[in-house]
């Protein structure tokens, strides 16, 4: 893997911010003895987060921004243990929409498409992420959510979703 000096500087800036905040990830970095990286090989020294680490941070231990900056909460289902709660800032929400927009663009979609959103909405990130990305793309969005097959098919035909 090749990495530029600018990328190393950006990673080190993030490492310092996490260490200074003394949050979940800052503590993981301290425990691993990581305060900076100098090369691509140093990525091997970065600590992993395992599922139990994330569960043990319940409910808001993964928060990396001040609480007043948190605008949304998403969560895993918690079917096999405690759910993993992910706090989002406004920038996180916007970044998520931009990433979804890029996915649509990579699939060849444009603002001329009509996108029917069928994943669920709520604590899970999928439905709202698909919708935010489609809106960022400028496409027409039909926010159906899951289920109701007859209605789904009718809307696909009537709205000519792509």
Report each predicted region and the residues it spans.
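Nucleotide 5′-phosphate-binding alpha/beta core
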Residues: 1-75, 80-98, 102-106, 110-112
């Amino acid at each position: 893997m090749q990495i530029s000096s600018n990328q190393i500087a950006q990673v080190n800036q993030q490492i310092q911010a996490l260490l200074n905040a003394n949050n979940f990830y800052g503590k993981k970095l301290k425990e691993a003895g990581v305060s900076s990286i100098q090369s691509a090989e140093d990525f091997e020294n970065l600590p992993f987060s395992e599922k139990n680490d994330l569960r043990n941070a319940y409910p808001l231990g993964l928060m990396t921004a001040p609480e007043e900056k948190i605008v949304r909460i998403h969560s895993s289902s918690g079917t096999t243990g405690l759910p993993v709660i992910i706090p989002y800032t406004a920038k996180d929400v916007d970044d998520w929409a931009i990433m979804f927009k890029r996915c649509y663009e990579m699939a060849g979609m444009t603002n001329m498409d009509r996108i029917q959103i069928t994943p669920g909405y709520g604590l899970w990130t999928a439905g709202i992420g698909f919708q935010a990305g489609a809106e960022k793309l400028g496409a027409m969005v039909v926010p159906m959510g899951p289920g109701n097959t007859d209605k789904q098919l009718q809307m696909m035909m009537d709205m000519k979703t792509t």
